[in-house]
């Protein structure tokens, strides 16, 4: 048997990407040189106290406000790390509708996605981002000795990813946002609810599972675990414990697991020990809370879940069926009808949402859905869609809109929703449900952030939640525009109010657990309608009864429950606040109180004047024979990337010099690369085989137009590319007289079309997908080197025999002439490079069937955490019709893969083996391959 190892090209950015995951406000990684804004965005800047705030002109008012806030709060944000000042650019991104924020190095910057979400904390959105992301800036400054530009930034970033676990970065930042304000995620029961539920139900999660997640169970994640651990560590070891830990890591940077060792030095325990201590401590505290909080058991109206599954926003239909938005580890989001026997019928899949949301009335479903700009994907939209259950007609009511939380009137004729423009101006609007026309806009003179509105039964009154720095409030507005505040600003997590006759039901956590409450609009008396053990959400009225449907949280997610409307006292607040010690240590109150109101000079930010931003010198390893150093430059707006470097080719004993740039401001992306490189060839002569060497200058220009579209659960991608190059060879040694010294402008063209359906976490591949790819290479300007290559590839993905199985049929064809006769531009059979070919490669037909085997969630000490194990079989044909037929594949066999985290690092490593059996006509032994890939 032959042994072969297959590896990805390794570059130090593997660890750079690792840590970028840690420092996004959601678990979504920032990809360097990633998304762009449209060319027409007009940028300005404010420079104050080390902060360079770069923002679109529409955000002038918010930029002035945040310039005051950021420079005032940073000394308090960094105080427990002994970091008093910083230098960092902050880019305000206002073109998108996905709420997020991050800090990075390489280049050093922070980005705030300024459009506020419809459900988050009980404070101003940009303030919430600032107090969290600035803590990351302080962490970085502590680790880089406070250097404004810590060159080489990507090396520092990679070192941080290797040295420090993600739970610290995010847990410390969440602890900070919680202790410095009246809000913060540490004060939200629903944020920590999955972990509380698991512990109280006797589900003890391993350290790795809690941090890295599961494809089987609901796992809390490193934000939540990190907050709890950081809180316990600060309580035990004091306010400045992390200052000491990070200083020790900075002073002794080259060690194995430096964070664990430094943490043990200053707190007495390493990370895993602190996790076990914290789990036991919070479990005991939550058990006491459960004893003090009377709770009810509610019958479950959906099928018993075997893995993490959410049945969100249940609504009872007139025929007794229940409509929900279902999503699970094995199923992407879709509307589902559930009958009285708990049988499920899938109705319609949907696309990405900022949060799960829909409304139903009179056979009509309405929801909002995120759509990305086809080219400039920093810009996204929130569009309104409807689906008629009777006619099965799908309709998109708005295009290129920024409309959120649509809710139908009882007769299904009107939609109330929230609209937010590029300046963060918020409006409550009413739309015609038939055509999407805005028929009314309500005044919002204070520009409160409005969330989750809904109509009363006759459509004459609307209720909604507002958010500002002081907290959340509950309101009504009538047909005349008169507003009434029913609940004053509070840190309670008020959300999704609906009318119950003359009263209003809503979600809050008055007893320390998220439950459903109601308020009498006349007396303003608040009563409890549910008494859930872990959390109750999303009430809906069952017409003609005195009951409501709602989501009751349990071990595997959001279940469907029902209860009678019986008003009870809200009960005592028994919430367990684990951040109390850190809050007392900081002793700041709300850092956003008493902010100065200064006015700052605003100047244009010229994109062309800021294209070059050299931030790093990194090692690059291409393979076992070639490696070197590379300077990297990325501008702050992700529109221009450049690099220059040198590699040493060990097998040739010579250096190679490279440079390149990518310009991404326009609809096409232009890529220019240059290389001065050594080359070697072997050629036959009458005296035998001889070796020839030369150097060459190689210049390549390419233009790519990537177009991405989406609609419901379907995604479409079109990509057109064209390129050419010029090669000039010199310093020739031992080469024949007819050796070509110049290659003039060969043309490369290609087109790719991709259609995929939305996938679930367990899906190995899309259930349905089609890919067609064409490429053509020619030599129109160089007659002495004539030769063409045309290639086409088609990929068809189908569902397998069981859930999450995948079958792929891939057909490839190429026709090559002239100097390209022996070139290859198509996928080959497994084992191709090890097997002697019968003839030139013209086509391949590749069948692959892949399937999950089990989900062990197995922690092998500190070595590995195995998330899933998958199998696959394959049958591959080459040159069908000449060298093989459908009964005689060239290769066939099976493979086994495991998805895991190694050494407690974040990248998902796919480690696998493949056994390739070769058709007996080739007289070749079986081939064994070891496969190593990674994703982030």
What annotation goes with each model-predicted range?
Residues 186, 307, 326-335, 349-354, ...:
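A flexible loop/linker signature enriched in serine peptidases of the S9 family
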Residues 33, 107, 124-129, 137, ...:
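Acidic/His/Gly-enriched intrinsically disordered linker/tail segments
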Residues 29-159, 165:
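Juxtacatalytic substrate-recognition/specificity segment
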Residues 623-627, 653-657, 693-699, 716, ...:
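Residues that define the transmembrane beta-barrel architecture of outer-membrane proteins
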Residues 687-689, 737-869, 881, 932:
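C-terminal outer-membrane beta-barrel translocator/porin domains of Gram-negative envelope proteins
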Residues 374, 533, 537, 555-557, ...:
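Outer-membrane beta-barrel translocator/channel fold
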Residues 35-36, 42-45, 245-247, 251-357, ...:
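Beta/coil-rich, acidic/histidine-enriched accessory regions frequently appended to metallopeptidases
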Residues 287, 326, 508, 559, ...:
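Outer-membrane beta-barrel initiation region
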